[in-house]
Each structure stands twice: as C-alpha cells, then as structure tokens.
C-alpha cells in the first residue's frame, strides 16, 4: 500500500510539472532575473558612492591647500612690512584653479538618487559659491601682492639697520615710489579687508615719503634734533603698518570662518562612507 501511495504521489507531481512547466520556467527566470538586476544595481550604487567619496576627498584636500594659501597671503603682506623674506604666494592662482576643478569633477557625478547625500551636497555647493567668488577675487590681486613682496621687502628694515640718517635717507627713499605704487594697486581689490589694508598702508607710506623729503633737507642743513624727530616719526609709521598688517591677518581668517566649508565637506564625506558600508 505505501508503495502504491508513493507512486500515485509521484505521478501527481509529474503531472503537475507537465501541465505547469511553462509557468514554473517563467517563475525561475523571473527570480534569477530579479537577482541579477539587484546585484547590478547594488554594484552600480557601490561604484557611484565610491566615486563620490573619492571626489569629496579630492575636494577636501584641495580646499585645505586653498585655505592655507589664503592665510599665507595675509602673513606674506605682514612679513613684507617687517622687512623679512615673505612667504611665496606665486602659485596661489594654480592652487585655486585646482580646487575649482576638483569641485567641477564632483558636480559631474550623479548623486540625485540619494536624498541625504543630495541635500548635504546642495548645502556645500551653495556655500561654495561664496568661497569661489572670494578666491577668484583674491586671484586678481596675487600679482600685486607678489609685487609688494618684491618692491617693499627691504623698505622698513633700512631704518632699523642703518643708524646714520645720512645713509638712511637715500637708500630708503629709492624704494618708496615703487613700494607705494605696489600698495596702491591693491586699493581697488574686491576683498574688503585687502582694500582696507592697502588704503591704510598707502596713507602711511605717503606720510613716510613726505618725512623722507624733510629728512634729506634736515640732513643737508645738519639739524640733528629735526633728524631724530623725523626718524622717530617714520619708525612710528612703520610700527603702525605692522600692527595694521597683523590685524589684516586676523581679518582674513575671520572672512574665511564666515565661508568655511570644512564641516560641510566632512558631513558629505561621512554620509557617503556610511552608504558604501551599507551597500557592501
């Protein structure tokens, strides 16, 4: 009996498969197809997220370089007024261009399918517009800043190293016209702190220029008391320039804080890293 029952069951199964073999085959194909599509989409997501992650990291790296370059610009002008070798900023424009290109590469990636990453990305892009304007405006002033380093790097050190006023006047005066001209070129900068710095320094430079003419006259006439008074006035102006330049270094850092992108990039990086781990 058990054998007969088993045979009947076997026949029913065969009959079922025979009658429904087409449906069963389609079901198998459907399941396999869905699995393949799911794996492809998963791999595509993984690839997209990794591309975003690498691009964001590239932006972060270039942003740090751009930020350091901006800060060095402030230090360079301050060092120029101190009469010590300034930090070179001649490669600043290239660094800013590299940053902009890394952002452009990120913009070309498709991340609209992920709402969280897309939102964070949009926040970064909106704030980056301000940073982009800032570095573009600074790029236009780099030649003038480098010219200041070239024309003014010895101007203020002369009075501190040469104690004889008869020697001070001609060597100092020879540098003044080109130095004043270099600072004047910065007065029209669209960066407010830079324009303000140039205006203040130019006024003090012009004042020193007037003092130098008086110093030469007093030196010729041998008026020792007048000579010492003028030298002290020039030194006072020089000290004021250094204070103003130091204030500019702080102003430029404050401007950077207002448009800082570090947290936005970190958040974008963190979101993308989590997605990669989830997909894997």
Q: Residue locations for each model-derived region?
A:
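Extended amphipathic alpha-helical interaction segments
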Residues: 121-243, 258, 262
């Amino acid at each position: 009996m058990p054998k007969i029952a088993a045979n009947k069951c076997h026949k029913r199964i065969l009959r079922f498969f025979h009658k429904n073999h087409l449906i069963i085959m389609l079901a198998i194909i459907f399941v396999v197809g869905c699995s393949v599509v799911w794996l492809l989409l998963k791999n595509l997501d993984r690839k997209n997220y990794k591309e975003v992650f690498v691009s964001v990291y590239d932006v972060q790296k270039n942003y740090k370089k751009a930020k350091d370059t901006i800060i060095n610009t402030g230090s360079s002008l301050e060092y120029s007024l101190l009469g010590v070798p300034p930090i070179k900023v001649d490669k600043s424009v290239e660094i800013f261009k590299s940053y902009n290109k890394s952002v452009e590469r990120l913009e070309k990636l498709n991340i609209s399918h992920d709402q969280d990453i897309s939102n964070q990305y949009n926040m970064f892009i909106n704030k980056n517009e301000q940073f982009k304007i800032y570095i573009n405006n600074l790029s236009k002033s780099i030649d003038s800043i480098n010219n200041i380093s070239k024309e003014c790097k010895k101007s203020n050190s002369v009075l501190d190293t040469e104690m004889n006023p008869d020697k001070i006047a001609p060597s100092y005066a020879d540098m003044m016209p080109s130095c004043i001209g270099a600072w004047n070129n910065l007065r029209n900068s669209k960066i407010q702190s830079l324009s303000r710095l140039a205006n203040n320094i130019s006024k003090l430079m012009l004042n020193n220029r007037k003092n130098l003419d008086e110093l030469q006259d007093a030196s010729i006439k041998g008026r020792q008391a007048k000579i010492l008074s003028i030298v002290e006035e020039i030194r006072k102006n020089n000290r004021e320039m250094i204070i103003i330049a130091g204030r500019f270094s702080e102003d430029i850092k404050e401007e950077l804080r207002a448009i800082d992108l570090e947290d936005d990039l970190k958040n974008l990086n963190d979101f993308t890293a989590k997605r990669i781990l989830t997909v894997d």
